[in-house]
């Protein structure tokens, strides 16, 4: 038999003491003491009834009368009332007696400054709330309302739909202005657990804590500018920063001269003259360059192929670079329009910005036709001498590439030289007109060409006597000998002409006096030796040293070197191109090597395990042991070859290469 003992002070009442109290009335099976009540199990029903009758109202402690009765199972439905702001002087028995005046109280528990009272009937609970809410008990106004748990559910009762937090319509009677509380969001209805059918209400809006941009699973799509993967472009920036120049120079087919230069640097230009098909050389000279005055300065400076090739291959040829490209890629000192004296389509006659300007009629150059220098310097050895009409007419008897030139007589075209623009050679600080006749050889002149006379110009280049005829400057070659191809010219024919031509071919087009004055014969000899036919180069080596030395430096050092060595020694490697002779790629070109290099170079992103003294660091007392530092960009970004992020991000490919994101991705979650 189970006996309920109420109003027990659980703090100072032990089960043994309570069992000794019930022992005289029968056998006590067990005794359990709770906070303010206890349960005693007795074997015999008669002994239990005797104990209830004798001990009910007994004071185990002074002032605390026990409530002893048969234990009853709790009713299936009770109404739980919350009583707040309970005074510390109010006991559970006093609170129970206060509520029992309004109805049967099943249970009353006081916890600190609040209490819960369970009443059997709903009407009694509502009456108690209405009467006792705001009532002063032991000096404090109590707050009485239905508990948030509402009605205790029996096993057969359905779950209430709608608001779970408060009883529907139950307002605060102490403050009548407030109606029944309703939750702002009904989770059961929103997530499909509503027991009722469709009630006509629209679905409530999603609560704000899982907004689209805050959800870890569903982010806003990245902006379109970042969607394109960066692998589309880094190859252009990493390996060949100058797209048209580098790619064409490295990878163009044999249509461009760059391949010829790269594969056979010794006799590159001679080989290109011998081996190039007629499409690449003859057709531009024959068709495009037939009318030199019709070409614009930009087309002229684009090189031997003019408009016949796309800009990539045109830029990759020798004379065909623009101003910046040719200064990077040509023989080392050549400007855009003079980049190679062999390949320019409109060297001195057809270019508006780089021809030789207004010179006197007696000048050796004005006897050339405007289109005579369109051919290579090697192919028209007679172009620089003041040749007679008969000798220059021999050009008309050459291949069809010169037949298309507008003038039959070369010395009849002195007018185009007088009509050139101010950017031509006439605008240079020291024109050729002002050269005195005193200097007989170019090497013996301490000053630049500004000090030379007009009349002996032809002789001054090859260190020949002024009195000799123009044919003498070409090695006394007969005019018919000029019709031979570039590779077939005799050594004697090439001797004088290269002495004159190479100097012009190696000069930039901007100012001629200063380059002639300051440029040593090293770049001239090297650029000449690196590109000529071996036969022509041998004839050039046979020249006296002072015939070519503009600055008075002997060229024997360059002549004793092999042509490849001269080319390697004197050609400044272009900063943006890679040739066969280029050094191996830096780690900057490879994103994975770059990542390792970056992580070693910048200490903030360096991993501790990569340090040589990592063991000593971790064993020292002053080191803060922490996991290896993780860069903020580790696995989210692709290598961005030219961004500043690469400097500070360390090895950002270490962890998850498959999850690399674009460079604008948010770096910290």
From Swiss-Prot:
InterPro entries xrefs: Nucleotide-bd_a/b_plait_sf, RBD_domain_sf, RBM14_RRM1, RBM14_RRM2, RRM_dom, SRSF
Bias (Low complexity) ranges: 287-303
Residues annotated with Phosphoserine modification: 161, 220, 242, 244, 256, 272, 280, 520, 523, 527, 562, 582, 618, 620, 623, 627, 643, 649
Alphabetic keyword roster: Acetylation, Cytoplasm, Immunity, Innate immunity, Isopeptide bond, Nucleus, Phosphoprotein, Repeat, Repressor, RNA-binding, Transcription, Transcription regulation, Ubl conjugation
One annotated GO biological process: gastrulation
One Gene Ontology cellular component annotation held by this UniProt entry: nucleolus
Tissues and organs where the protein is expressed, per its UniProt entry: Expressed in all tissues tested, including brain, heart, skeletal muscle, colon, thymus, spleen, kidney, liver, small intestine, placenta, lung and peripheral blood lymphocytes.
Keyword hit for Repressor: yes
Region (TRBP-interacting domain): 307-354
Position(s), cross-link Glycyl lysine isopeptide (Lys-Gly) (interchain with G-Cter in SUMO2): 126, 135, 138, 149, 153, 164, 600
Modified-residue entries (Phosphothreonine), positions: 206, 572
Residue ranges occupied by any RRM domain in the UniProt entry: 1-73, 79-149
Modified residues (N6-acetyllysine): 164
Sequence segments annotated as region (Disordered): 147-175, 193-232, 284-303, 566-590
Compartmental location: Nucleus; Nucleus, Nucleolus; Cytoplasm
CDD domains associated with the record: RRM1_CoAA, RRM2_CoAA
Gene3D superfamilies named in the record: 3.30.70.330
MF terms in GO: mRNA binding; RNA binding; splicing factor binding; transcription coactivator activity
Description of how the protein assembles with itself and partners: Isoform 1: Interacts with NCOA6, CITED1 and XRCC5/KU86. Isoform 1: Interacts with SS18 isoform 1. Isoform 1: Interacts with SS18 isoform 2. Interacts with STIL and interferes with its interaction with CPAP. Interacts with gamma-tubulin. Part of the HDP-RNP complex composed of at least HEXIM1, PRKDC, XRCC5, XRCC6, paraspeckle proteins (SFPQ, NONO, PSPC1, RBM14, and MATR3) and NEAT1 RNA. Interacts with RBPMS; the interaction allows cooperative assembly of RNA-bound stable cell-specific alternative splicing regulatory complexes.
General function of this protein: Isoform 1 may function as a nuclear receptor coactivator, enhancing transcription through other coactivators such as NCOA6 and CITED1. Isoform 2, functions as a transcriptional repressor, modulating transcriptional activities of coactivators including isoform 1, NCOA6 and CITED1. Regulates centriole biogenesis by suppressing the formation of aberrant centriolar protein complexes in the cytoplasm and thus preserving mitotic spindle integrity.
Name assigned to this protein: RNA-binding protein 14
Gene giving rise to this polypeptide: RBM14
């Amino acid at each position: 038999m189970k006996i309920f003992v109420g109003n027990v002070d659980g703090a100072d009442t032990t089960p043994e003491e309570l069992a000794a109290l019930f022992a005289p009335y029968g056998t006590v099976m067990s005794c359990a003491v709770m906070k303010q009540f206890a349960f005693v199990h007795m074997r015999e029903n008669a002994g239990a009834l005797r104990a209830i009758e004798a001990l009910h109202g007994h004071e185990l402690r002074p002032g605390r009368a026990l409530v002893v009765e048969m234990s009853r199972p709790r009713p299936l439905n009770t109404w739980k009332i919350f009583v707040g702001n309970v005074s510390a002087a109010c006991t559970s028995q006093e609170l129970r007696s206060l509520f029992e005046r309004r109805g049967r109280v099943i249970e009353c528990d006081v916890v600190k400054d609040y209490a819960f009272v369970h009443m059997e009937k709903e009407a009694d609970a509502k009456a108690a709330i209405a009467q006792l809410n705001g009532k002063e008990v032991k000096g404090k106004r109590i707050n009485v309302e239905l508990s948030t748990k509402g009605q205790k559910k029996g096993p057969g009762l359905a779950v209430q739909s709608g608001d779970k937090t408060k009883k529907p319509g139950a307002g605060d009677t102490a403050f009548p202005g407030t109606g029944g509380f309703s939750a702002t969001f009904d989770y059961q209805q929103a997530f499909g657990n509503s027991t009722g059918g469709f009630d006509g209400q629209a679905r409530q809006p999603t609560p704000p804590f899982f907004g689209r941009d805050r959800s870890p699973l569903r982010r806003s799509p990245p902006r379109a500018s970042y969607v394109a993967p960066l692998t589309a472009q880094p190859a252009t920036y990493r390996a060949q920063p100058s797209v048209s120049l580098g790619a064409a120079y490295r990878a163009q087919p044999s249509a461009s001269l760059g391949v010829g230069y790269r594969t056979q640097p010794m006799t590159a230009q001679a080989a290109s003259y011998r081996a190039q098909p007629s499409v690449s050389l003859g057709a531009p000279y024959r068709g495009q360059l037939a009318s030199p005055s019709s070409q614009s300065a930009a087309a002229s400076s684009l090189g031997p192929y003019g408009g016949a090739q796309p800009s990539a291959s045109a830029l990759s040829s020798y004379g065909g670079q623009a101003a910046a490209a040719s200064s990077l890629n040509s023989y080392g000192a050549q400007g855009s329009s003079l980049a190679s004296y062999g390949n320019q389509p409109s060297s001195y006659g057809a270019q508006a910005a780089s021809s030789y300007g207004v010179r006197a009629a007696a000048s050796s150059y004005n006897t050339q036709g405007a289109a005579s220098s369109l051919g290579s310097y090697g192919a028209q050895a007679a172009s620089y001498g003041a040749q007679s009409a008969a000798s220059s007419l021999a050009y008309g008897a050459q291949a069809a590439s010169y037949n298309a030139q507008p003038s039959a007589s070369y010395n009849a075209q002195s007018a185009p030289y007088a009509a050139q623009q101010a950017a031509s050679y006439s605008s240079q600080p020291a024109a050729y007109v002002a050269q005195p006749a005193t200097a007989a050889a170019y090497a013996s002149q301490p000053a630049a060409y500004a000090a030379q006379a007009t009349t002996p110009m032809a002789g001054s280049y090859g260190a020949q006597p002024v009195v000799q005829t123009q044919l003498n400057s070409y090695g006394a070659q007969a005019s018919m000998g000029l019709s031979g191809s570039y590779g077939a010219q005799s050594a004697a024919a090439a001797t004088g002409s290269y002495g004159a031509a190479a100097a012009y071919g190696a000069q930039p087009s901007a100012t001629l006096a200063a380059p002639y004055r300051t440029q040593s014969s090293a770049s001239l000899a090297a650029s000449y030796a690196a590109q000529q036919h071996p036969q022509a180069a041998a004839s050039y080596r046979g020249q006296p040293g002072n015939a070519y030395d503009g600055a008075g430096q002997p060229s024997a050092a360059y002549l004793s070197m092999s042509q490849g060595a001269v080319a390697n020694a004197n050609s400044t490697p272009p900063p943006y191109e890679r040739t066969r002779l280029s050094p191996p790629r830096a780690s900057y070109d490879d994103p994975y090597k770059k990542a390792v290099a970056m992580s070693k170079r910048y200490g903030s992103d360096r991993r501790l395990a990569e340090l040589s003294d990592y063991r000593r660091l971790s064993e020292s007392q002053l080191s803060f042991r922490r996991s290896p530092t993780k860069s903020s960009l580790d696995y989210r970004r692709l290598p961005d070859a030219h961004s500043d992020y690469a400097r500070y991000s360390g090895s950002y490919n270490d962890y998850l290469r498959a999850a690399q994101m674009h460079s604008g991705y948010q770096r910290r979650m």
